[in-house]
Swiss-Prot record:
It comes from Neoponera goeldii (Ponerine ant). Expressed by the venom gland. One of its GO terms (cellular component) is other organism cell membrane. It is found in: Secreted; Target cell membrane. GO terms for molecular function: toxin activity. Its main location: secreted. GO terms for biological process: defense response to bacterium; defense response to fungus; killing of cells of another organism. This is M-poneritoxin-Ng1e. InterPro entries: Antimicrobial_4. The keyword ATP-binding does not apply. Has a broad spectrum of activity against both Gram-positive and Gram-negative bacteria and S.cerevisiae. Has insecticidal and hemolytic activities. May act by disrupting the integrity of the bacterial cell membrane. Belongs to the non-disulfide-bridged peptide (NDBP) superfamily. Medium-length antimicrobial peptide (group 3) family. Ponericin-W subfamily. Keywords: Antibiotic, Antimicrobial, Cytolysis, Fungicide, Hemolysis, Membrane, Secreted, Target cell membrane, Target membrane, Toxin.
Length: 24
């Protein structure tokens, strides 16, 4: 369970950071 959660977060975080940088 935790392995899948970490892999999902690893994929999600870069996209969230990209969206945050676009807003600025």
């Amino acid at each position: 369970f935790w392995g899948a959660l970490i892999k999902g977060a690893a994929k999600l975080i870069p996209s969230v950071v990209g969206l945050f940088k676009k807003k600025q």
